[in-house]
Amino acid sequence: NQCEGAYNEGGRGLSSVDVIPFGPDRFPVAMGTLKMLDCDAGHFYPSHEAIDMYHHYKEDIALFAEMGFKCYRLSIAWTRILPHGDDAEPNEEGLKFYESLFDECHKYGIEPLVTLCHFDTPIALIQKYGGWKDRRMVDAYTHYCEVLFRRFAGKVKYWLTFNEINMLLHMPFMGAGLLFEPGENVLQTKYQAAHHELVASAKAVQLAHRLMPGAMVGCMLAAGQYYPRTCAPADVQAAADADRDNYFFIDVQSRGEYPVWAKKKMERAGIQLRMEPGDEALLKEGMVDFISFSYYSSRCITVDKTLLDDADGNAVTGAARNPYLKASEWGWAIDPVGLRVTMNSLYDRYQKPLFVVENGLGAVDTVEPDGSIHDSYRIDYLRAHIEQMEKAIHEDGLPLMGYT
């Protein structure tokens, strides 16, 4: 749904991604501190047109085939299927669009990898329930999944339940449609919403296995190993803690239970999850089949607050610049070896197949008069990361399903 555009065509309803603007209001809206549940003329909304894949998917997929791609990762827009998020009957026009898209992929021998929810909580459900803070979102999501699984069984084998699910804790409106009232316990609300998404993910896995024998369902993490800024024990511990926090959701989705460290952390913070009878069994029975993740850079962390200002290579808030790495024009550390390190960390922790589903370089590109972009720097970036994946496969023996 990030690239298709056509946000108000084909019977599609409004979702959270449609009201997150470009510019200074982007992060306040994404974080739930600035309420915006509709569009206005004073903002530019990137999702409205995006790259207009909705109208150009056939030529786009033909170009994929020309490049030799064997997999296309895409997201289905929840509100293109269920405009209000929980409609009893799906939008047939939306189903036909994706059906045609999948057929086009298969025509060229390209396997679709489909994300079920990619930062697009239906606005109608945010207004009705408050987004994922409400348990009823689990039923709405499960209904949505069932519609897709029944319709696309045989066309889609690989599924992801939630895109970068760990971003819920950092950008809660973007990740879960959360808005906060004055005096609300924000941390309690975010972790409760997280529990609802984890339960929904487990239900989706079970449903997919029942309706589509042979299908594989994965989780999706915004990944990137944390390095200690120095070898000081406090920095080493800070890096270990940051990695563990980042793996919270995947611990539950891959191991089927809340880890002890997370329970202790919530206890210290006064967080009390409301769980229904059977939730723990459901999490155990709905574990994912593989681990997918995005990787753009590693992170560097220190307890020395004076170093946090020197962060031009910082891709996340509260990290320090790594003096051993170059940074992109956007300030993100370029670390191909970090991809291999991250892959090994994930496999050592979970012992499940891996899938790199996002990787790339942002840059200030120059568009030539003929429309071409001579981005040798991006080619170099991708080549270096692919070389590290090759080492992870052949030298480390990691089971890598794909790279897209």
Predicted regions and their residues:
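Active-site mouth loops of central-metabolism enzymes
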Residues: G42-H56, G131-R136
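Short, flexible active-site loop motifs that bind/organize anionic cofactors or intermediates
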Residues: S47, Y54, G85-A88, E329
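Catalytic domains of carbohydrate-active enzymes, especially glycoside hydrolases
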Residues: D52, H56-A77, E111, E285-I291
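Glycine-rich, proline-tolerant flexible connector loops at the mouths of alpha/beta enzymes
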Residues: I76-P90
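Active-site region of glycoside hydrolase catalytic domains
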Residues: N1-A41, E66, H84-D86, L95-T404
